[in-house]
Amino acid sequence: MTSPPYYALRDYGKENQIGREGAPEEYIGPLVSVFCELKRVLRSDGTFWLNIADCYSRKSYHGLSGCKPKELMGLPWLLALTLRKEGWFLRSDIIWQKDNPMPESAKDRPSRCYEHIFLLTKSGKYFYDNLAVAEPIALSTAIRYRYGRKENTKYADGIPGQMSRQQINNPCRYGKTEINPLRNKRDVWNINTVPYKGAHFAAFPPRLAETCILAGCPKQGIVLDPFMGSGTTGAVAKGLNRQYIGIELNEEYCRLAEERIKKVSGDKKIGEGCV
């Protein structure tokens, strides 16, 4: 799981950093190269969770090909479709919705409050623990199950897995009946941002990393983050009994991440041979 640097937003002060390119295609290219290497080392049944946000073209940008000033660039989908051409299976586009987004001064469009999380895999068969991230069903759904479905209506046949009123009201005749209180995780996740007292001001919330890791990585599995930042993914991975490998260009963030992960795991050897 990873979240690469935003495009044309921040300067991390490092040579060969990603995010300060002069054109969207020049930003996408290095990311694709990184993720092709990730694909090479990923298990055949592994998953890749990619968090990326879009941005708008500005007059201060130079050499932007095909982007007019004030135009939404479409970077997430440009990257996702390019990765699909490289052989990745694009399995899901998850919307990370934030109720506490960064305020914006624009008065001629809605304010942004979401980012994309793409689920990509190496094949059509892969590890995905749907029960680990299942959601409780809504109260209204439980009530509908209680009353079942009426006869002689367009809903008489119900939906797969739905029980009839007779099954619920007469369990002795129809056999044991149980209502599953959980439903499959949906693709809009409402998770607020959480401030972190550290040097990295673009850290995503631990709950976001937790959901992806629980669903896509088995216990004792390895989580790889090629853009480690302040170590949110690493801290969550260690807390969930997963192994972790983090890669970071900025030494300051590396030290911050090491300290953060050590607090969770208590392992003093963390950071030895840090990439």
Language-model segment annotations:
Residues 1-266, 274:
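Core catalytic lobe of class I
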